[in-house]
Amino acid sequence: MGDRVILHSDINSCYASIELLHHPELRGKPVAVGGDPEARHGIVLTADYVAKKHGVKTGMALWQARQVCPDITFVPPRMDLYLRFSKMAHEIYGEYTDLQEPYGIDESWLDVTASASIKGDGYKIAHEISNRMKSELGITVSVGVSFNKIFAKLGSDYKKPDAITTMYKDEFQTKAWNLPASDLLYVGRSTDSKLRKMGIHTIGDIARADEKWLNSYLGKMGSILWAFANGYDTSPVRKENTSAPVKSIGNSTTTPRDLENDEDVKIVLYVLAESVAARLRENGFRCRTVEISIRDNELYSYTKQTKVTNATNITKEIADAGFRLFKQSYNWQKPIRSVGIRGADLVNDNYWEQLDLFHNAELKDKMMKMDAAVDDIRRRFGFYSIQRGLMLGDTILSAVNAKEEHTVHPHGYF
């Protein structure tokens, strides 16, 4: 049996590239996608290559980005727009294989083994996909071509932007083994620090090390990294039918004043939940888990999560689940400075599940219709054109920027 043909496609500077399509006047200038630069905790979500050359990095505070690149332009994130582009990219990928596994909004593994005999080898398919992404979507991708997922991802990271890199069996030692160990999937800062203390600096060092010795220091991750470095990854590209291309959609905000009671928190949770639920609906997702994050005015923070009975994208169900979590977990010894809520463990709208015995279908249908009506009004007249009655209790809190810190997170590898 021949080797598999696996591609890993990575949209270059995804958010920034999409924004530049809508802001052509910013091409050739340093641009970063992030929150309001006046906000207390805005960060860079992604930067274009001009900004990166000036030292701007993902995760950098906006004020830090301004320090290293005074001429930078900040563009607020529009996750619904990026998700639409992600769906269009997957439609292109789907013409080459139904075995595609998203890794966040901007990355995907594709198993094109079956179609390689018809459409040509992996490199040819990668080249065709790359050209179509440019001509049809106006964005570039870096594509890795290999016999497994790990080296395909290394290939897409090897050269950016707009590049195709092969990592075949007869060449991965030459191309991959000289790369830093931190380039290997799942070698984060902590693991990289441990490896350095062991005298391991490159992927080749991991490959040549004794597996049992790695295990003695890193536990089972030692064997996993050793197998990855030696090309022994046999994990399949998982066909995604009901899972969403991202694992969560969330929203958080640092409030304009400290929160001092349950009602304050409820108002903010509802504002944030409305944004999260609306984006779930816009992109055809439902969540099976609701998570909240709380930070007090002395910067102590925690997160709590709960499973919902049935997957949902209904605003009230998400907000109520979050508020129940909060009341169960917070003792009000200190005022609250920041609140977040996230819909996690996402599935597509076509996800089927058995309803529980006490499920009220009529009430759920009524809430869905109400959300749809609210969505329509807000599309036409703006987010704040219609609000819930509880938000009238504090117009300052109910006016927090519902889209300020909207975030999405990719699925893990395992």
Describe every region a protein language model picked out.
Residues 1-227, 240, 278, 364-414:
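Gly/Gly-Pro- and Ser/Thr-rich, intrinsically disordered tail segments characteristic of DNA damage-repair
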Residues 14, 37-40, 297-300, 346-349:
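Short, charged/polar surface micro-motifs in flexible loops or helix N-caps
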Residues 103-107, 146-149, 285-289, 334-338:
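Short Gly/Ser/Thr- and Asp/Glu-enriched loop/turn motifs at secondary-structure junctions
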Residues 323-380:
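C-terminal hydrophobic structural anchor segments
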